[in-house]
Each structure stands twice: as C-alpha cells, then as structure tokens.
A protein has these predicted regions:
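Mitochondrial intermembrane space
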Residues: 1-162
Length: 162
C-alpha cells in the first residue's frame, strides 16, 4: 500500500467516522464485498427518503439517485422545485458514512496504487502524449495552468484529464 493512502486513511480514522467506515478502512483494504456493503447501506438510506440509489458507471465513487426516482420524488412534493434542490443534499447525507470515503478509496487505490498526486499523473500523461508546452513547467506552474479557466489545452489533454 502506498504511504499516501495509509496516511490519508489514518487521518480519516482519527476523525469521527461511521462504524461501517471504521470496519472497512481499518485494514487499509477495501474488498468488492465491502464496497457492496457500503452501497447497500447508501441504497437503504436513499430508499428511506423516497429515492432509489444510482451508482453511475460503477467505478466505486459515483453516487446519486436514479432519474426515475428523482421525477417521482418531485411529483410527490407540494413544491417540486424545492424537492429537486433537496436531492443532492439527501444524496450527500446518505453518502456520508457509507459510500463517500469507502467508494473514494476503493476507486483511488485501484486506479492509482502508487498514490501519486493528480499533478504527477497529469504530467506523465501529457509528456507521453507529446504536449511540449508543459515540459519545462514547475509543479506550481503546471497547477496554475491546469487551474486557469482561460487556458485552452491541446486536444491530447482530454485523454489525461477525462
């Protein structure tokens, strides 16, 4: 396990986490069965609030409510627009203690087992894609470029940051 993941999980466990999170994260590994358990807990919470859970593309990190259940939730409300505004808050509240951190680390530890920073991953991808303009940039300069909303990157960047 990368030091980064151990350090981040230690910090998380030192904070106030749910019993499920403590159980799943204690050994610094998240199995498929543990992710399924976290998803089930999230789905129960959403169902208790009248929404059906949706996990997007199944990457372990995406969560929300199905469009059908959002439509039904809005239709059942006296104020459909207010109900629509409540859905992200409900989804986040249900994710807290269930899928939020467990899903994040499940995804991150598999897609980036070395625990490299996003900036390191971008630099490596951009350099291998032949994007010359970033070659001599410091990490700070690259971060500023990535954060600059007026910057129009070359097409190769899409493969790195999508």
């Amino acid at each position: 396990m990368a030091d980064r993941w151990r350090t981040e999980i230690d910090a998380l466990l030192a904070d106030d986490v749910s019993a499920l999170e403590r159980q799943v994260l204690a050994d610094y590994e998240i199995t498929d069965a543990e992710l399924a358990e976290a998803r089930d807990a999230y789905a129960r919470c959403m169902s208790d609030r009248g929404l059906e859970a949706d996990f997007g593309d199944g990457d372990g990190f995406s969560y929300g409510a199905t469009q059908e259940s959002q439509d039904a939730f809005r239709s059942a409300s006296a104020d459909p627009e207010a109900a629509l505004d409540q859905i992200p808050t409900i989804a986040d509240a249900c994710a807290d203690g269930t899928i939020w951190d467990i899903g994040l680390y499940y995804h991150e530890m598999r897609s980036n087992p070395e625990g490299r920073s996003l900036l390191e991953l971008w630099r490596e991808c951009l350099e291998s894609a032949g994007v010359d303009e970033i070659h001599d940039l410091t990490d700070q300069e690259l971060q500023e470029l990535v954060d600059d909303e007026s910057y129009v990157p070359p097409p190769e960047v899409g493969t790195c940051v999508s």
